[in-house]
Regions:
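Residues that act as N-cap/strand-start positions at coil-to-secondary-structure junctions
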Residues: 1-2, 224
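Residue-level marker for the onset of beta-strands and adjacent loop->beta junctions
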Residues: 3-4, 27
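Charge-rich, well-structured scaffold segments of protease-associated domains
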Residues: 5, 9, 17-20, 64-220, ...
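Active/ligand-binding-proximal structured segments within catalytic/core domains
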Residues: 13, 20-71, 251-263, 271-273
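A short helix-to-beta-strand connector/capping loop
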Residues: 14, 224-225
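Catalytic cores of enzymes that engage adenine nucleotides and/or redox cofactors via long glycine-rich
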Residues: 221-224, 274
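Short Ser/Thr-interspersed hydrophobic loop/turn segments at strand-loop and sheet-helix junctions
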Residues: 267
């Protein structure tokens, strides 16, 4: 447990967590629900995201305009997000606004009014259309379905137009009743707010939530070596490469963070330097890590013109292979560790970051470590740890590749250039 953090479990099973920061004006508040797109049946894909939207349409105590006007008066934006495994609401308000802010957030989570379903469904359909016009985002959805085929964890978080268009109030109410239960909710706060006061406010605001049976998630089954191409009349081809990663409580996550930083996490990373700075082949290139309950995803993404595609992917394949072989450059492992530790401390200057870490870790059952312990774990990562993880996660034939662009022949040629150093049938 981190110093200064207190956690209380209410009779409903709801957990209240806080970190006292008396030296700031604002209190960061968040409500986290253990439900996301991974928990949806195929016919209602997108229901978690639509429900998140609908929470803003009003509750039994606060209509939509009252919610909007209150947070405008607070000088705050009430935000929400849906991921594959969680849904959250969050805001940052002054101390005097905490009671009303929590009352509104509690009412949204526990007693939504399910108003204006048709209108909000149209908003989400417009969001999906916008997303479909953004190929550098859309390519990750194509990759997800390659890596986790025919599984909820691989489907787009927001669903698709056909399933979202069929969602009605009955489906939304059923999803809320099944998943918005006390023991699936965490309320977190960071700032000048005493824990006992927060607990009392949450008990009043989130009343009506009761414990419910926990719904087990089927274990994800990752595929390997698959490819997909979507033809679009674009100037660039957008590429996403991905493979199966590790779960969010795996002790190797610290080594994976170092590996990700070395490969494509910053301005001195291999992908950025070799593909963009040295060769000028891309505007954007990066690696990424995503954690789920028992598994995860690792990968990289870039966009470039067809004539540059084979060279760019060939360089990426070479860098992945070199890391898996333990060919490190002078100082890069230590530099990556220094970066991670510095970013940890800089991020923790933010009450929003502290609140988010509390809520996210508790709702997903990740141990709450002190900043000192996290830094110690990062310091303990060795070159061998990074090499072994790279060799495992980027093993021959393990990676799936998705592309969106104008020229499938150029895509296939680039896959050949990528496969040559990496090996396998990616």
């Amino acid at each position: 447990m981190r110093p200064g953090v207190e956690v209380t479990e209410l009779a409903s099973g709801l957990r209240v967590a806080s970190e006292l920061r008396p030296d700031v004006h604002g209190v960061a508040l968040g409500a986290w629900v253990r439900v996301g797109s991974r928990d949806e049946a195929a016919p209602v894909a997108g229901v978690s995201h639509l429900l998140e939207h609908l929470l803003f349409r009003g509750t039994e105590r606060h209509d939509a305009m009252a919610i909007a006007e209150a947070f405008d008066r607070f000088g705050s934006d009430l935000q929400a997000a849906t991921s594959r495994e969680e849904t959250d609401l969050h805001a940052r308000v002054l101390s005097e606004h905490v009671p009303l802010a929590l009352d509104i957030m509690g009412s949204m989570v526990a007693r939504p009014g399910f108003h204006d379903v048709e209108a909000e469904r149209e908003v989400v359909l417009e969001e999906l259309a916008l997303y479909d016009d953004t190929p550098d985002d859309l390519v990750h959805d194509v990759l997800g379905e390659l890596l986790f085929p025919a599984q909820a964890i691989g489907r787009p978080i927001a669903g698709r137009a056909d399933t979202v268009g069929a969602l009605d109030e009955e489906a939304l109410r059923a999803h809320h009743a099944r998943h918005y239960a006390g023991d699936q909710v965490v309320v977190a706060a960071a700032g000048p707010l005493e824990h006992e006061r927060l607990v009392a406010l949450v008990e009043a605001a989130f009343d009506g939530l009761a414990p419910a049976p926990t719904h087990a998630r089927p274990a994800a089954v990752a595929a390997a070596g698959r490819r997909a191409f979507v033809g679009r009349d674009l100037e660039q081809t957008h590429i996403a490469v991905g493979g199966c990663g590790i779960g969010r409580t795996d002790d190797r996550r610290f080594a994976l963070a170092v590996l990700d930083q070395i490969l494509g996490g910053g301005a001195s990373s291999r992908l950025w330097q070799e593909i963009r700075e040295q060769r000028g082949l891309v505007y954007s290139v990066y690696s990424y890590v995503t954690y789920f309950q028992e598994t995860g995803q690792v990968g990289l993404a870039l966009g470039t013109r067809s004539e540059n595609l084979a060279e760019a992917l060939g360089v990426a394949g070479t860098e992945i292979h070199d890391l898996a072989q333990g060919r490190f450059r002078d100082g890069e492992v230590q530099r990556a560790k220094d970066n991670l530790k510095a970013r940890l401390l800089l991020t923790m200057d933010s009450t929003v970051a502290r609140m988010s870490r509390l809520g996210r870790h508790l709702v997903s059952d990740v141990p709450l470590m002190s900043d000192t312990e996290v830094a110690r774990r990062i310091d303990g990562v060795t070159e061998a740890d990074v090499r072994d993880l790279a060799a495992e996660l980027f093993a021959s034939g393990a990676l799936c590749v998705a592309g969106i662009g104008p020229d499938e022949a150029a895509f296939d040629a680039a896959l050949g250039a990528f496969r040559e150093p990496v090996g396998g049938a990616a």
